[in-house]
Amino acid sequence: MLPALLNTGLGLRRGLLPELLAMAPGAVDFLECAPENWIAVGGAYGKGLAELAERFPITCHGLSLSLGGSAPLDWQFLDQIRQFLDRHQVRLYSEHLSYCSDDGHLYDLMPIPFTDEAVHHVAARIRRAQTHLERRIAVENISYYAAPYAAMSELEFIRAVLDEADCDLLLDVNNVFVNACNHGYDAREFLEGLPRARVTCMHIAGHYDEAPDLKVDTHGAPVKEDVWALYAFACERFGVQPTVLERDFNLPPLAQLLEETARIRDMQRSWGGQRHE
């Protein structure tokens, strides 16, 4: 029987698979994977995923649904996602508030224009996807470097989408920090403007300091102290939510990542410690 409570998670990456399979029970509360990277995967990787899914709850963070795209939603792909989520009893499914296809796959997460028209477009697609998947979706605030056309602020856009789509928010704390530095707004004021009830999970990750006013979200380094401080503020405002440490590149030994997940757990305990059900 899997534990009913989630707090501290780690991204499931193929490069970590041998160490994750040997990881002690309770080292983390859950693992998060991108379903696109594991659907129909067999062999040693498929067996490894099946073994981990028996030992740890699995959550999913999608990469290619392209909720903001202009092409029709891919219903066959959504069927595959739903089957994967059902097979592994996934309780939390999230996707990026972005688009990644336009007459082909772009292999990047592009920001959606901050307009009323875009709000209506993406909210309708989220509602249809939620209906097809028979579960709620948490959309993630993305990092972006070239600001899209904006008739409203990023905060106003996110709030409008959450309201019209009636979906949840995966709050990426590092992305808030990166965008605040790059686009000149206050990260804490941004968090204060988000609706508490919509935040159901969080991400935290490292970034690269290209310049004092240019941060790059890399997922390739340890979490920086300024981001830890912003995460503490997020816990204070939104309560303890399932939080994933993301690390995609320059993977260190698992023990180093578990030092960071232990810090997440300690901070969660200091901000109320009531686990998320």
UniProtKB/Swiss-Prot annotation:
Report any Pfam family annotated for this entry.
MbnB_TglH_ChrH
Residue ranges of the TM segments: none
Taxonomy, superkingdom: Bacteria
- Cross-referenced InterPro entries, in alphabetical order? MbnB/TglH/ChrH (IPR007801), Xyl_isomerase-like_sf (IPR036237)
Q: Which family does it belong to?
A: Belongs to the UPF0276 family.
Q: Cite the NCBIfam families for this sequence.
A: PRK05409.1 (NF003818)
Which protein, by its recorded name, is this?
UPF0276 protein PputGB1_2003
> Which organism does this sequence originate in?
Pseudomonas putida (strain GB-1)
